[in-house]
Regions:
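Conserved beta-propeller blade repeats
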Residues: 1-3, 29-47, 58, 74-95, ...
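Beta-propeller blade-edge and WD-like acidic-aromatic loop motif
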Residues: 4-24, 43, 49-69, 88, ...
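Hydrophobic/aromatic anchor residues within beta-strands of the central parallel beta-sheet
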Residues: 12, 149, 196, 331, ...
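Short, solvent-exposed loop/turn and secondary-structure capping segments
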Residues: 55-57, 102, 148, 195, ...
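Cap/lid segment of the alpha/beta-hydrolase catalytic domain
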Residues: 138, 294-296, 301-434, 438, ...
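Flexible loop/turn segments at secondary-structure boundaries
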Residues: 146, 169, 191-194, 216-217, ...
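Extracellular/periplasmic ectodomains of large secreted or surface enzymes and adhesion receptors
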Residues: 180, 198-212, 219-232, 242-255, ...
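Active-site-proximal cap/loop segments of hydrolase catalytic domains
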Residues: 380-584
Length: 584
C-alpha cells in the first residue's frame, strides 16, 4: 500500500509488483493522511480529517468495498496499534476543549466492539498490544524530550510503569517482545542520542543494543518471531540501515541504499525481505525492498516529479558555519544549475519548523523549484534547537534562550556575505510553522539585510499562541516554549514576540494561513498582518478556507506556489523567468 496524489488529494493505492501499475483503493474527498495494514488480513485502516482541522477519524477498509468508520465524529484519533494477529486495534482519542486523552480498544472488523479502556490528563498513545490481547503498551508524553512507558492490564484497568527509575528520558517507537517480558524502544537514557534498547518489564533494567553509535537511531522494526532486527541511523541527516540477527548477535549483509532519508520499514511475514520507503534529494518518496540474504535491492515505485526536469535537479551541499558563540551550525545548500561561477545569485533562507525538526537531504520540491525557476540559491539551516545532533544541541534554544536560534541566522547572513557567488543584497527569509516564527523574528532583527520575507502559519506571539492553540497540545508546547502563566516567561514572551516588535519589520512580507489550523490558529497571522500593515509596509495575505496546518490540496498548493513566485520575483527584481544562462 502506498499513499500518493494523482488528483487533488492524496489517496491510498495498491502496487502488487515492482514497477507495477497503481490501483487506487480510497476515494475520499479529503486527503488521506496515511494507512496501516491490519496484520494477518487483506485489510487496512486509514485516517483523514476535514479541511485540515486535524480531528482525525479512523476507517477500516478492504481492498474493495466501502470503508467502515471506527471513530466518533468531532474527536481526534491517533497512535494506532494492533495485536500481532490483527484481531485487536488500539488508539488514543482527544476531544475539543480538553487536555484529557482516552485509549480505545476493539476488533477492527467490528466498530461496535470498540470501547474506552483508560483515560487520563495529558498526551498518551498506544504503541503495541500483547499477543494474548491482555495488555496495551502505551507512552505518556511529557514533552518532546521526555516520555514514560506503561503497560495497561485490560482486565483490571491497572497500569505498570516500565523503568520508573530511569529519570528524564525520551522513549519513542516502543513495542513489546513477543512474550511481553521485555520492551524494545529508542531511548535517550544516559546518552546525548537516541539508542535502541531492550527493557526488562519486571526489573526495569535495559540492555543497549546500539552502544557505540554517535547518531540517533530514527526507527526500527523486528520480525514477527523476534529474530531479525533492522534499524535506521540518522547519520548527519542521511539514513543508514543496519540489519542484525538477535539470536546469533551477528550483523547480516547491509543494504547499500541511495543517499537519502528513510521513515518506515517492515519485514515481510516470511522474513526474507525488508520493505522501506526512501526519499532522496532528487527523487520523491518511493518504496523499496531488500532481500535479507543480501542478494537484491528492488525499487517498487518511481514517483513523478511534476513539471521539474530530473536532469536539472540540484544535489544539496552540506556546509557548516560558526555562530555568535562559536557553536557550529550546519545547513544544506541547493544551488541552481547552469549558473556561471562568478554570478551572484539571490538567496532564500528556508528555516524548518518544529522547532524539534531537522532539514535533511530528502525530496524538497520547494528548494528544487526555487533553485530551478527563480535561479536562487536555497539555504536550509539547522539552527540550534534542531534534532539530529544530540539532546544538548536540541536544548540550546529552550525558554529564555529562544532568540539564540535567531542569532544563528545572523551568523548565516555573515556567511552569505562572504561567499563569492551569493548576492548579499538579495536575501529573503522563508519559513513555515515554527519556521514562520523564525521568519518573523529574523525580519525584526535583520530587516536591513533582507529584501523581504515569506512566512506560513507562524507564531507571532507565544503568549497568544499558547492561549489559543488546541487544548490537547497546550501543555506539550509549554514544555518546549515556556509557560505563559509564569510572570518571568511572560516577560520573555513580551520581549521577543514578533508582534511586539512589528515596527522593526520594514521589508515586504507574504503571509499564508490555513483557516482551520488547530496548531497555530489563524489569529496569529491576522494580528501580525494587521500590525505590519498599520506601519505602511507592503504585506500580502493569503488564507485558504479549506486547509489547516499545512496545505495538502493540489489546487491550493498550485496557487500558493504561484503567489510565492510572483512575490519573490518582485523582491529579487526578476521581471521574467531566469534563462538558461542564469541571467535575467
Amino acid at each position: 500500500l502506498i499513499a500518493t496524489r494523482f488528483g487533488s488529494t492524496q489517496q491510498i493505492h495498491r502496487v502488487t509488483m515492482p514497477g507495477g501499475a497503481r490501483t487506487q483503493i480510497t476515494f475520499q474527498s479529503e486527503p488521506v493522511a496515511g494507512a496501516t495494514a491490519i496484520p494477518g488480513t487483506q485489510r487496512f485502516v486509514f485516517v483523514r480529517d476535514t479541511g485540515g482541522d486535524e480531528w482525525f477519524q479512523i476507517y477500516a477498509s478492504g481492498l474493495t468495498g466501502a470503508p467502515q468508520q471506527l471513530t466518533e465524529a468531532g474527536t481526534r484519533n491517533q497512535s494506532i496499534a494492533f495485536s500481532p494477529d490483527g484481531q485487536r486495534i488500539a488508539w488514543s482519542r482527544a476531544t475539543k476543549g480538553s487536555g484529557e486523552y482516552a485509549i480505545y480498544v476493539g476488533d477492527p472488523a467490528d466498530a461496535r466492539s470498540v470501547k474506552s479502556v483508560y483515560r487520563e490528563q495529558g498526551s498518551i498513545g498506544p504503541d503495541d498490544i500483547s499477543a494474548d490481547h491482555a495488555q496495551v503498551l502505551f507512552t505518556r508524553g511529557i514533552s518532546n524530550r521526555e516520555s514514560k512507558l506503561f503497560l495497561l492490564d485490560l482486565a483490571s484497568g491497572k497500569t505498570q510503569e516500565i523503568a520508573p527509575k530511569a529519570g528524564k528520558v525520551l522513549y519513542t517507537n516502543a513495542r513489546l517482545a513477543r512474550d511481553s517480558r521485555s520492551v524494545y524502544a529508542i531511548s535517550t537514557k544516559d546518552s546525548d542520542f537516541g539508542r535502541l534498547v531492550q527493557i526488562d518489564v519486571a526489573s526495569g533494567k535495559d540492555t543497549v543494543l546500539t552502544p557505540d553509535l554517535k547518531w540517533d537511531v530514527e526507527t526500527f522494526t523486528i520480525s514477527d518471531d523476534d529474530r531479525l532486527l533492522a534499524y535506521s541511523i540518522n547519520e548527519d541527516g542521511f539514513s543508514k540501515v543496519v540489519v542484525r540477527d538477535l539470536v546469533t548477535r551477528r550483523a547480516l549483509p547491509q543494504p547499500e541504499l541511495p543517499r537519502g532519508v528513510l521513515q518506515t520499514m517492515q519485514f515481510s511475514p516470511d522474513k526474507t525481505k525488508l520493505a522501506f520507503d526512501l526519499s532522496t534529494a532528487t527523487s520523491a518518496g518511493d518504496v523499496w525492498t531488500w532481500d535479507v540474504d543480501g542478494a537484491n535491492l528492488t525499487r517498487w515505485t518511481t514517483s513523478e516529479l511534476g513539471g521539474l526536469d530530473p536532469a536539472k535537479l540540484a544535489e544539496p551541499q552540506l556546509v557548516r558555519f560558526k555562530s555568535f558563540d562559536g557553536q557550529t551550525v550546519s545547513a544544506l545548500v541547493y544551488r541552481p544549475a547552469g549558473i556561471a561561477a562568478d554570478f551572484r545569485t539571490p538567496v532564500i533562507m528556508d528555516i524548518h519548523g518544529g522547532p524539534e525538526g531537522q532539514t535533511r537531504p530528502s525530496w524538497n520540491v520547494g528548494a528544487q523549484y526555487f533553485a530551478g525557476v527563480l535561479g536562487a540559491t536555497v539555504i536550509l539551516p539547522n539552527v540550534r534547537g534542531s534534532t539530529g545532533y544530540g539532546r544538548r544541541y536540541a536544548d540550546l534554544d529552550n525558554a529564555e534562550k529562544r532568540e539564540d536560534s535567531v542569532k544563528d541566522i545572523g551568523a548565516l547572513l555573515d556567511w552569505i556575505a562572504a561567499q563569492p557567488n551569493l548576492d548579499k543584497n538579495r536575501v529573503a527569509v522563508y519559513g513555515q510553522s515554527y519556521g514562520g516564527y523564525m521568519s518573523l523574528a529574523v525580519s525584526t532583527h535583520f530587516a536591513d539585510r533582507l529584501v523581504g520575507s515569506v512566512e506560513r502559519y507562524g507564531i507571532s506571539d507565544f503568549a497568544s499562541f499558547l492561549k489559543n492553540t488546541e487544548a490537547y497540545r497546550r501543555d506539550n508546547r509549554r514544555a518546549e516554549y515556556g509557560d505563559e502563566r509564569d510572570p518571568k516567561m511572560a516577560a520573555v514572551f513580551k520581549r521577543i514576540a514578533p508582534l511586539a516588535n512589528v515596527a522593526k519589520i520594514t521589508k515586504p512580507m507574504l503571509v499564508m494561513q490555513g483557516a482551520n489550523d488547530p496548531r497555530v490558529p489563524k489569529s496569529e497571522s491576522d494580528q501580525v498582518v494587521a500590525g505590519i500593515r498599520a506601519n505602511g509596509v507592503e504585506t500580502w495575505y493569503v488564507v485558504f478556507a479549506d486547509e489547516g496546518h499545512g496545505f495538502l490540496k493540489k489546487p491550493n498548493n498550485d496557487l500558493r506556489r504561484e503567489v510565492e513566485t510572483v512575490f519573490l520575483r518582485k523582491l529579487f527584481k526578476q521581471p521574467r523567468p531566469i534563462g538558461e544562462s542564469g541571467q535575467d
